[in-house]
From Swiss-Prot:
PANTHER family: EAP30 SUBUNIT OF ELL COMPLEX (PTHR12806), VACUOLAR-SORTING PROTEIN SNF8 (PTHR12806:SF0). InterPro entries: ESCRT-2_cplx_Snf8, Snf8/Vps36, WH-like_DNA-bd_sf, WH_DNA-bd_sf. One of its GO terms (cellular component) is ESCRT II complex. This is Putative vacuolar protein sorting-associated protein 22 homolog 2. GO terms for biological process: protein transport to vacuole involved in ubiquitin-dependent protein catabolic process via the multivesicular body sorting pathway. Belongs to the SNF8 family. The lineage of its organism: Eukaryota, Viridiplantae, Streptophyta, Embryophyta, Tracheophyta. Gene3D superfamilies: Winged helix-like DNA-binding domain superfamily/Winged helix DNA-binding domain (1.10.10.10).
Length: 120
């Protein structure tokens, strides 16, 4: 069916069909880059990076506007990673979203401290 209308479902771009049908490997590609960024920054942030900072790292890696990455793209990519058994998780602390890349549970005290820290 895709060949009849000239669409390659495995094309590595964020196009109309990939967005509409959830096909293509754009989000898996972003997922791999998310893993790379989280691994590179883990020694600085302990495995907890703000979604905004993560997206900024990805935008620096992907120079062209056509390949710009939004926070929604990151969230979708992380949800695709979960399907593969990944331990990456998006958590909300205060009003900010963070990506946790370590399998550690945060207790109430950790959450409270992080919430206070996000205010500054």
């Amino acid at each position: 069916m895709c060949a009849n209308i000239g669409v390659d479902p495995l094309a590595s771009n964020k196009g109309f069909w990939a967005e509409l049908l959830g096909i293509g490997d754009f989000y898996y590609e972003i997922g791999v880059q998310i893993i790379e960024v989280c691994m590179l920054t883990r020694s600085h942030n302990g495995g907890l990076i703000s979604l905004q900072e993560l997206c900024n790292h990805l935008r620096q890696r992907r120079k062209t506007d056509r390949e710009a990455v939004t926070e929604d793209d990151c969230l979708r990519a992380i949800s695709k990673l979960k399907l593969l058994g990944s331990r990456f998780e998006v958590i909300t602390i205060g009003k900010k979203k963070f990506v946790r890349s370590v399998p550690t549970e945060l207790n109430k005290d950790h959450n409270h401290i992080l919430e206070l820290a996000t205010r500054f």
